[in-house]
Amino acid sequence: MPGDLSPALRLLQGGEMTKEQYYAEGMELFAQDKTDEAIAAYQKALAQDPNYADALHALAMVYASVEKLDEAIEVGQRLIKANPEDELAHTSLSIFYQRKGMIAEAEKIGAKARTLGWKRELEEMKQAKQSESEKN
């Protein structure tokens, strides 16, 4: 079945990889310390879907891992623009700012991450209470 083909075999047979396959390839390459190739794979995933959150997260982390903090910050900002309620995106961007010495920016984004975390926790507590009351 064509859906069962590995990404490399699919390419050899002329089929384009999906964004998920490019993302998975990027993860494998990053695990092998092939950062340039991982970056290229994530960029191919993002060419198909510029707001693909998993690829944006991964690309930002690869850039940060090789001290390309300007690039990590730019991708982190793109991720937040695409997913403004993403707590992890805010936390990561705060870390990138901090590592670059941009403390005021790090604190501002970090505060937003904490606020999003509190909102998530409140919503989880509300849902737990609702589930409990429905059982009774």
Question: What are these model-derived regions, one by one?
Answer:
Residues T18-Q48:
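Alpha-helical segment of the N-proximal tetratricopeptide repeat
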Residues A31-Q43, V66-R78, K100-K112, G117:
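Structural signature of tandem alpha-helical TPR/SEL1-like repeats
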Residues P2, L9-K19, I95-N136:
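Terminal, low-structured helical/coil segments at or just beyond the last alpha-helical repeat
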